[in-house]
From Swiss-Prot:
Keyword Hydrolase: yes
Name by which UniProt lists this protein: Imidazolonepropionase
Binding site for N-formimidoyl-L-glutamate: 142, 315, 317
Taxonomic source organism: Xanthomonas euvesicatoria pv. vesicatoria (strain 85-10) (Xanthomonas campestris pv. vesicatoria)
Textual note on the cofactor: Binds 1 zinc or iron ion per subunit.
Gene that encodes it: hutI
Cofactor: Zn(2+); Fe(3+)
SUPFAM superfamilies cross-referenced by the UniProt entry: Composite domain of metallo-dependent hydrolases (SSF51338), Metallo-dependent hydrolases (SSF51556)
UniProt keyword list: Cytoplasm, Histidine metabolism, Hydrolase, Iron, Metal-binding, Zinc
Catalytic activity as recorded in UniProt: 4-imidazolone-5-propanoate + H2O = N-formimidoyl-L-glutamate
UniProt xrefs under HAMAP family: HutI (MF_00372)
Domain of life: Bacteria
Role noted for this protein: Catalyzes the hydrolytic cleavage of the carbon-nitrogen bond in imidazolone-5-propanoate to yield N-formimidoyl-L-glutamate. It is the third step in the universal histidine degradation pathway.
């Protein structure tokens, strides 16, 4: 069998195990043709391969490229002042009520043009790529007008054109009530003006809503979901981060790809997510940074068979984090997730949360050839160590980056 590139003498984490584990292969190879994997597995069981080029991995580990399935990467401004306020005792709600929080970033993002937004966002993207990320989601939500939301999504598209990475755009117009606005009137604008325009321009694949007592109600979220589905957009939700608004249960009824945060998720919401196949996206960076104490119900989610994904939640206010490796460590330490769960959370399950499990997140024939090659002794090293970047090489669509 002809292939363009062959990586051999490697240890693999295929994430393709029947038991849901890492799918470890001790003496493995990965063969790529036209940007897709044609074989990934044990060298001894491989077909005869005729590569145009071959790379000896010298027993390094290969995993699927990392996938960050929840980010707010495109924004302007800085909220270090709010960090200081929280250290002095202010709560998330206190800061938002005083005109800070999301709307502070809205003001800065509205004031920035495309070039300024791109310049601010590229270093954050490059930091993620430097830790093996090959796909990431980018949400809007810091514009809160049609023109400014489109601007954010346009910059997300520009980032994908400038780097070897897949960007999955999500419209998060229902992130906060605009300064001086009224929630119901704004939701009407989101549904009747923004969603149709963004869908027509092909700028987003999904919508997201911040369903919370200081943002939008369950009824308002449902209105967004109805409009989104009418325009062919998929559903995601920020749910149960600060209180139980039953947003995850609602989103699951609409076949949501994921419900994210979910610290206050109850058993009814868990059952709804399990029945719908909705992924739980856990965001330990936000939990850590806001010094939260309400743990997401990890054990109950496991028992129910809800897939567990992880993400950085890169954003300026509650998770200024661009390190998936540190997010894995946080998930293990704070949420007591296992090594296998942490690695799967940034690969196989993250792909599921983005509706891409048919081509991303695993090493097997037919998948896109997105790889991360690591200088580690064992998979646990990716989760165990902090401030350590063992990435040897990143491969996107079969090309070394």
């Amino acid at each position: 069998m002809h292939c363009d590139v062959l990586w051999h003498n490697a240890q693999l984490m295929t994430l393709d195990a029947a038991d849901g584990g890492l799918g470890i292969v001790d003496d493995g190879i990965v063969a790529c043709r036209h940007g897709h994997i044609v074989y990934a597995g044990a060298a001894a069981q491989a077909p005869a391969l005729q590569p145009d080029s071959a790379h000896d991995c010298r027993r390094r580990w290969i995993s699927p490229g990392l996938i960050d399935c929840h980010t707010h990467l495109v924004y302007a401004g800085n909220r270090a002042n709010e960090f200081e306020q929280r250290l002095r005792g202010a709560s998330y709600a206190d800061i938002a009520a005083a005109g800070g929080g999301i709307v502070a970033t809205v003001r800065a993002t509205r004031a920035a043009d495309d070039a300024a937004l791109l310049a601010a966002s590229l270093p954050r993207l490059d930091a993620m790529l430097g830790e093996g990320v090959t796909t990431l989601e980018i949400k809007s939500g810091y514009g809160l007008t049609l023109d400014d939301e489109v601007k954010q999504l346009r910059v997300a598209r520009q980032l994908a054109a400038l780097r070897k990475v897949e960007v999955v755009p999500t419209f998060l117009g229902a992130h906060a009530v605009p300064p001086g606005g009224q929630a119901q009137h704004y939701i009407d604008q989101v549904c009747t003006q923004m969603i149709p325009a963004i869908a027509t321009q092909g700028l987003a694949e999904a919508v997201d809503v911040f369903c919370e007592h200081l943002a939008f109600s369950q009824a308002q979220a449902e209105k967004v979901f109805v409009a989104a589905q009418a325009h062919g957009l998929r559903i995601k939700i920020h749910a149960e981060q600060l209180s139980n608004q039953h947003g995850a249960e609602l989103a699951a009824r609409y076949g949501a790809l994921s419900a994210d945060h979910i610290e206050y998720l109850d058993q009814t919401g868990i059952a709804a997510m399990a029945a719908a196949g909705t992924v739980a996206v856990l965001l330990p960076g936000a939990f850590y940074f806001t010094r939260d104490t309400q743990l997401p119900p990890i054990a109950a989610l496991r028992t129910a068979g809800v897939p567990l994904a992880l993400a950085t939640d890169c954003n300026p206010g509650t998770s200024p984090l661009t390190s998936p490796l540190l997010a894995m460590n946080m998930a293990a330490t704070l949420f007591r997730m296992t090594v296998d769960e942490c690695i799967a959370g940034f690969t196989r399950e993250a792909a599921r949360a983005l509706g891409r499990s048919e081509r991303l997140g695993q090493l097997r024939a037919g998948m896109d050839c997105d790889l991360a090659i690591w200088n580690i002794d064992a998979p646990a090293d990716l989760v165990y160590r902090m401030g350590f970047n063992p990435l040897h090489a990143r491969v996107w669509r079969g090309h070394l980056c």
